[in-house]
A protein has these predicted regions:
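Terminal alpha-helical segments
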Residues: 1-97
Length: 97
């Protein structure tokens, strides 16, 4: 599926919504993701499970920031999956490598 088709389908299904690109909100998410990564690293030797959970949150926040910059946001009850799908379809082949 092409990126364009993915966007069309997810908008039609109500999984994505268009919005004005938001640099300020994206920046806040990136700064929070940086803190999350620092926290994950600090906790790795203490509790590996927590470290991975916090690292996952960093990935999610970073990807949501990217979506905001592209003029989209996830909606409905599948937000985590929608964010991952968005990045997969945007990055395409590069993500697989």
């Amino acid at each position: 599926m092409t990126y364009k088709k993915f966007i069309e389908d997810y908008l039609a299904e109500g999984l994505l919504k268009r919005q004005k690109p938001d640099l300020k909100s994206a920046e806040k998410l990136i700064l929070r993701a940086q803190k999350d990564l620092q926290t994950a690293k600090a906790n790795l030797s203490i509790d590996e499970g927590i470290a991975y959970t916090v690292a996952y949150l960093a990935m999610l926040r970073s990807a949501r920031a990217f979506m905001l910059l592209k003029g989209f946001r996830p909606s409905d009850g599948y937000q985590h999956q929608t964010v991952v799908d968005f990045m997969f379809h945007f990055l395409g082949k590069e993500l697989k490598e």
